[in-house]
């Protein structure tokens, strides 16, 4: 069996390395040819994991269509806003395609699974999402990690033996939508938690943001037709807790920099990698307006990042909203 990984960034490379023990070959493709060259010449992804020697069965492929043709299972690990334009250029027969990307397409408000279905023209039963609390730098070092594979359970059950390793445990779920929404929106809430930390608001505020943020995620899961209970699993609560508290979280780090007074441009530059929550919050803002639902935390993050609202003022607006029950009727 051959695995094809589309996107050789930090997460794509980590998945290629940890799963290489289960495949004869792991082929990787990336738009950045320098990354592929470094893997080809030294078995090291110098840009993202310069301290990790990759297994020798990980092989760079410079033509995306070739990688698709010679792979039995595909994992897509590229920024959400570039998935459609990348996959629309290739053809694929029905084979499992797993999204490890997290986000919502800004223009269409569609999830990654919908983008892949439209771009690739394959049966939806072959489309999956891999999501959960999983920092790439820990996964690639073989530190214990548990995630969830969401999609068609009949096909998914057959994939588990190829995705599980001694240190990488994969559970199965039939809620593709719920897993995708959780993985996408948690980045926005993590930015909020980071802003709070950057302002020095402490542990109480962070815990409150995470908890109320989870409620916002459940609202969006329901709107997209997923199971709200999914938010209490690895792809929801698990991923949110990690991303909102972990020192390796790009979204939390970005938020902290904003809270400390850096401009958006300065913060993005200092992080140095894709901050998915920065673009996802634009989609969440549109979802809020389209469906007329209250998403107060996400809304304040949007205002801070795109309307130059002072982070302290945003926090005060959250704290001084009208009195409410903890859990309101749906979509209120």
Swiss-Prot record:
Active site as annotated: 186 (proton acceptor)
GO MF terms, alphabetically ordered: glycerol-3-phosphate dehydrogenase [NAD(P)+] activity; NAD binding
Binding-site residues, sn-glycerol 3-phosphate: 102, 132, 134, 186, 239, 249-251
Organism superkingdom: Bacteria
List of residues binding NADPH: 10-11, 102, 136, 250, 274, 276
Annotated Pfam families: NAD_Gly3P_dh_C, NAD_Gly3P_dh_N
Function noted in UniProt: Catalyzes the reduction of the glycolytic intermediate dihydroxyacetone phosphate (DHAP) to sn-glycerol 3-phosphate (G3P), the key precursor for phospholipid synthesis.
Name recorded for this polypeptide: Glycerol-3-phosphate dehydrogenase [NAD(P)+]
Organism annotation: Sulfurihydrogenibium sp. (strain YO3AOP1)
Gene this chain is encoded by: gpsA
